[in-house]
């Protein structure tokens, strides 16, 4: 017997079976950057319609975590898929570089500004630290395979960006949105600074819960309001609070104008309580017997005076809609210096905004003898005892509740009224315009719209000033006496911005006001405050996108961040853009969930369930990480664990194996000379190209909708089901045994070439390294990189009006599935070994029989059997297997007759009829020594 291996067209490719991504990817990255790949893409896409995904800047502090990886990979998938869709989609990554976390890190090494180092030295150290952090994070982001302008990212500490941030504030002032006020703001005692809404986190805390009695100044007048004939003892209005330390700042008591309040006689005094709260209060304070002396609505008690328990002033009753009956007494202790609602009602009634608390959280001198200099939280017990001594404490208990904490220090914060600068939500209609703009944006998922609408509708004015060292200065001058802004503020801010553009923010602190305004400087002082870092990042649609030429003056199309950014970057960006330009900075806003472990738990070092992206890349490669991100429905929580990543690695192997099979079977194929015209191709090859077209339509639509898990599912279905379990299986015989350059094989190779040309493009946005690797093994002339290409436009499909259309092949696949079941059973029964040892008879009804017989002799190639016949359904023997899924089909199997051909392994009766190839079947003789077999259908 001869060795016929040399006569077969065995698959051959240098494309490795194993990805070895962790080893290979760094070399590919090096080539990308040596070749300046990002510049190559920009050049290739020049002049096309732009799509701008504006990067929300991560904070330049610490190593990247798995959440950063999810975010950057999602962005990269979008940018690359937009490039494939024919857009010029530049991607400029950015970093948020000012602010408190960096100050803290620098303080740990060189001390606080003004102590061991000057403020200027401190800022220089902060700038240096931030630059180092950017470089570390940048290396990790690049390793993820994210393509962008890494040589020229935007940093909020770039001199030009710092200058543009000042200009952004100038435009907002010019539009009338800025005002100054001593409003209560979130204040961190450790930071000694105001905090933004997005810098506040809520944790459980135990606080003293107290009911306090304020005695009526004019008992008779109050008694008359209730129409009470006789009251035994003083009349007290009872408030409830969990912040005893705010009692020194109490200036009023709020009642709801429409709630009913009762005067209730208890032993030795009468209490005023909301009618609906009497029972719960009495139960709480342990009173079992009381008498109701009268009822009035809250409005009737307006401006009645009640004596502060330990200070000399009288607290009037004020009316507010913010009073609820959810807890307490229905009477709200009101300290305008320590609460937003209290402040609003204080403004309405012209009540003093008292703030007896210093920046470090201790009471200022002159507050009260036993309180001066005491930390507010430590003062709680002192105040409780003081109230007890004065006979004003009705009840004390401990309350476990959710309380605001500083995001950085994880310590409780307070509301504290300080002179601050605010962007007003209402004085120039910013709130109304923002709500209008929200409706014109596409929010993905769509619940994001209601979420940000609610936040904008209910948010207070934005406190944009901070008492920090490392930040962009507000660059304002105020009059020494009136504290009014300089009338030429906008002109002065531009002059400051020009200096900052040259020398950075230090230029502001080095500036002598006389240089800008001459003798007028004697009447003005420089505002020492810096801007909230959310102003820095929120203004980047102006300071970066408008300023950089590669964006061509276009507004951003998409912002993509975690779902916490509705109150963070999405909010600050919306406020600033609307305040500056009257319009939203984005057309689409897409949010992703947070990473959790395989059990749905939040990741934390204490639980030991964190997954490091660096470890994953070093072990499995970035493409596995990228495939995991794409495979996940990121609209909710994103689960990651070793097991989940292993599943992604398994999916990757299936896709890689498909690509390798395609490449290996394109050996010796040159599309310029060997490609077969569509109309001359074998029908099943045309069908396979059509399946690729259908898959591409679905995949492109899913990329367009940002449904990347749908992309992966469709890709897997195409590779594993449509190709792997059918087409790639049935073509092996023709591919390996047909004449090398005959039409039967070239038709097949043409289909494989079309398919892999499409497949490599589908993969490129997600499995970028592997797509680049495949690209290098594809036959034919092509661009240097797949990333400059567009979706493959060479695909075509079978026409529906043809007998052998998609519906025909779909039914044939079902028939093949039923035949496979019968073969598997025969193998289990040891009647046959492989499927080529079998010959089948398909007993079919007339309609199905017509379809099956149209394949003629080629039916057996579809079924992968040595013989296949079609017979009348009615004549089926008793042992024929009835199909459960294909109507009008029974299947009988017998062992194939004849001898096994050593070349093609088919069983046939025509072996030995050619003297030169005595042990070969007739078909193989034709393929080896003749003109090659003819195939029309399969």
From Swiss-Prot:
Residue window of motif 'KMSKS' region: 602-606
UniProt binding sites for ATP: 605
Motif ('HIGH' region): 58-68
Swiss-Prot/TrEMBL GO biological process terms: isoleucyl-tRNA aminoacylation
Bound cofactor: record note: Binds 1 zinc ion per subunit.
Subcellular location: Cytoplasm
Primary location: cytoplasm
GO molecular function: aminoacyl-tRNA deacylase activity; ATP binding; isoleucine-tRNA ligase activity; tRNA binding; zinc ion binding
Reaction catalysed by this enzyme: tRNA(Ile) + L-isoleucine + ATP = L-isoleucyl-tRNA(Ile) + AMP + diphosphate
InterPro entries assigned to the protein according to its UniProt record, in alphabetical order: aa-tRNA-synth_I_CS (IPR001412), aa-tRNA-synth_Ia (IPR002300), Anticodon_Ile_BEm (IPR033708), Ile-tRNA-ligase (IPR002301), Ile-tRNA-ligase_type1 (IPR023585), Ile-tRNA_ligase (IPR050081), M/V/L/I-tRNA-synth_anticd-bd (IPR013155), Rossmann-like_a/b/a_fold (IPR014729)
Any one Pfam family match given in the protein's UniProt record, by short name: Anticodon_1
Listed transmembrane segments: none
GO CC annotations, alphabetized: cytosol
Entry binding sites for Zn(2+): 901, 904, 921, 924
Sites where the protein binds L-isoleucyl-5'-AMP: 561
Keyword field: Aminoacyl-tRNA synthetase, ATP-binding, Cytoplasm, Ligase, Metal-binding, Nucleotide-binding, Protein biosynthesis, Zinc
EC numbers, comma separated: 6.1.1.5
Required cofactor(s): Zn(2+)
Database matches in PANTHER family: ISOLEUCINE--TRNA LIGASE, MITOCHONDRIAL, SOLEUCYL-TRNA SYNTHETASE
Protein family: Belongs to the class-I aminoacyl-tRNA synthetase family. IleS type 1 subfamily.
Function: Catalyzes the attachment of isoleucine to tRNA(Ile). As IleRS can inadvertently accommodate and process structurally similar amino acids such as valine, to avoid such errors it has two additional distinct tRNA(Ile)-dependent editing activities. One activity is designated as 'pretransfer' editing and involves the hydrolysis of activated Val-AMP. The other activity is designated 'posttransfer' editing and involves deacylation of mischarged Val-tRNA(Ile).
Subunit architecture: Monomer.
Domains as described in the record: IleRS has two distinct active sites: one for aminoacylation and one for editing. The misactivated valine is translocated from the active site to the editing site, which sterically excludes the correctly activated isoleucine. The single editing site contains two valyl binding pockets, one specific for each substrate (Val-AMP or Val-tRNA(Ile)).
Protein name stated in the entry: Isoleucine--tRNA ligase
Naturally occurring in which organism (per UniProt): Erwinia tasmaniensis (strain DSM 17950 / CFBP 7177 / CIP 109463 / NCPPB 4357 / Et1/99)
């Amino acid at each position: 017997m001869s060795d016929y291996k040399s006569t077969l067209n065995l698959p051959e490719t240098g494309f490795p079976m194993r990805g070895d991504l962790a080893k290979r990817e760094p070399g590919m990255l090096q080539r990308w950057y040596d070749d300046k790949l990002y510049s190559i893409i920009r050049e290739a896409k020049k002049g096309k319609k732009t799509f701008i995904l504006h990067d929300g800047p991560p904070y330049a502090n610490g190593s990247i975590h798995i959440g950063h990886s999810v975010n950057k990979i999602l962005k990269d998938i979008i940018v690359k898929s937009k490039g494939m869709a024919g857009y010029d989609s530049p991607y400029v990554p950015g970093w948020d570089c000012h602010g408190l976390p960096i100050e803290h890190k620098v303080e740990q090494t060189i001390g606080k500004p003004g102590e061991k180092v000057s403020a200027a030295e401190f800022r220089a150290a902060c700038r240096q630290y931030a630059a180092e952090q950017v470089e570390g994070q940048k290396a990790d982001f690049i390793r993820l395979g994210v393509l962008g302008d890494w040589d020229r990212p935007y940093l909020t500490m770039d001199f030009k960006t710092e200058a543009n941030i000042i200009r952004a504030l100038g435009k907002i002032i010019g539009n009338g949105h800025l005002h100054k006020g001593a409003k209560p703001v979130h204040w961190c005692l450790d930071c000694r600074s105001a905090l933004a809404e997005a810098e506040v986190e809520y944790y459980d805390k135990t606080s003293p819960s107290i009911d306090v009695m304020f005695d009526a100044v004019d008992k008779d007048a109050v008694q008359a309001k209730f129409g009470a004939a006789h009251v035994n003892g003083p009349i007290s209005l009872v408030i409830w609070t969990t912040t005893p330390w705010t009692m020194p700042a109490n200036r009023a008591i709020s009642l709801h104008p429409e709630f009913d309040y009762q005067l209730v006689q208890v032993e030795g005094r009468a209490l005023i309580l909301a009618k609906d709260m009497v029972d719960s209060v009495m139960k709480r304070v342990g009173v079992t017997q009381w008498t109701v002396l009268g009822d009035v609505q809250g409005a009737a008690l307006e401006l009645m005076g009640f004596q502060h328990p330990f200070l000399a002033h009288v607290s009037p009753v004020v009316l507010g809609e913010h009073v609820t009956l959810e807890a307490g007494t229905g009477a709200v202790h009101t300290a305008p210096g320590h609460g937003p609602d209290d402040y609003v009602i204080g403004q309405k009634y012209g009540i003093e905004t008292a703030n007896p608390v210093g920046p470090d959280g201790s009471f200022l001198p002159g507050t009260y003898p036993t309180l001066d200099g005491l930390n507010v939280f430590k003062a709680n017990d002192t105040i409780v005892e003081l109230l007890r001594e004065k006979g004003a404490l009705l009840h004390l208990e401990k309350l476990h509740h959710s309380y605001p904490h500083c995001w950085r220090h994880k310590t409780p914060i307070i509301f504290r009224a300080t002179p601050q600068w605010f962007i007003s939500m209402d004085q120039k209609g910013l709130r109304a315009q923002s709500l209008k703009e929200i409706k014109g944006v596409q929010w993905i998922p769509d619940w994001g719209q209601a979420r940000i609408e609610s936040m904008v509708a209910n948010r207070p004015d934005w406190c944009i000033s901070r008492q920090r060292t490392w930040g962009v200065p507000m660059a304002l001058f105020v009059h020494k006496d009136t504290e009014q802004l300089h009338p030429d503020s906008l002109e002065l801010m531009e002059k400051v911005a020009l200096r900052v553009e040259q020398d950075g923010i230090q230029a502001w602190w080095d500036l002598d006001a006389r240089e800008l305004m001459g003798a007028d400087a004697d009447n003005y002082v420089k505002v020492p405050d810096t801007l909230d870092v959310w102003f820095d990042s929120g203004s980047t649609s102006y300071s970066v996108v408008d300023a950089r030429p590669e964006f061509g003056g276009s507004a951003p199309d998409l912002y993509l961040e975690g779902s916490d950014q509705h109150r963070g970057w999405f909010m600050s960006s919306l406020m600033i853009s609307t305040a500056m330009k009257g319009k939203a900075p984005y057309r689409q806003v897409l949010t992703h969930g947070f990473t959790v472990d395989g059990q749905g738990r939040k990741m934390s070092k204490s639980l030991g369930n964190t997954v490091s992206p660096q470890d994953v890349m070093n072990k499995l490669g970035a493409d596995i990480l990228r495939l995991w991100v794409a495979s996940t429905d990121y609209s909710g929580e994103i689960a990651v664990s070793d097991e989940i990543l292993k599943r992604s690695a398994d999916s990757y192997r299936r896709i890689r194996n498909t690509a390798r099979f395609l490449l290996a079977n394109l050996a010796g194929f040159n599309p310029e000379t060997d490609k077969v015209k569509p109309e001359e191709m074998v029908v099943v090859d045309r069908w396979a190209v059509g399946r690729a077209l259908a898959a591409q339509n679905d995949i492109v639509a899913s990329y367009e909708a940002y449904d990347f898990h749908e992309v992966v599912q469709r890709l897997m279905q195409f590779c594993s089901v449509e190709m792997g379990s059918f087409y790639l299986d049935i073509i092996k015989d023709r591919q390996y045994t047909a004449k090398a350059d005959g039409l039967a094989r070239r038709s097949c190779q043409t289909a494989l070439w079309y398919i892999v040309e499409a497949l490599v493009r589908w993969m490129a946005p997600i499995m970028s390294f592997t797509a680049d690797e495949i690209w290098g093994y594809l036959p034919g002339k092509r661009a240097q990189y797949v990333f400059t290409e567009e979706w493959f436009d060479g695909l075509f499909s079978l026409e529906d009006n043809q007998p052998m259309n998609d519906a025909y092949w779909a039914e044939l696949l079902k028939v093949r599935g039923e035949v496979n079941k019968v073969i598997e059973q025969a193998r289990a029964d040891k009647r046959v070994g492989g499927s080529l040892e079998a010959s089948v008879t398909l007993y079919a009804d007339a309609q199905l029989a017509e379809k099956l017989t149209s394949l003629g002799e080629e039916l057996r190639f579809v079924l992968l059997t040595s013989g296949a016949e079609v017979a009348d359904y009615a004549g089926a023997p008793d042992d024929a297997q009835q199909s459960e899924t294909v109507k009008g089909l029974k299947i009988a199997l017998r062992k194939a007759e004849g001898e096994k051909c050593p070349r093609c392994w088919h069983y046939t009766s025509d072996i030995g009829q050619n003297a030169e190839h005595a042990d070969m079947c007739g078909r193989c003789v034709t393929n080896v020594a003749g003109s090659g077999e003819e195939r029309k259908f399969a």
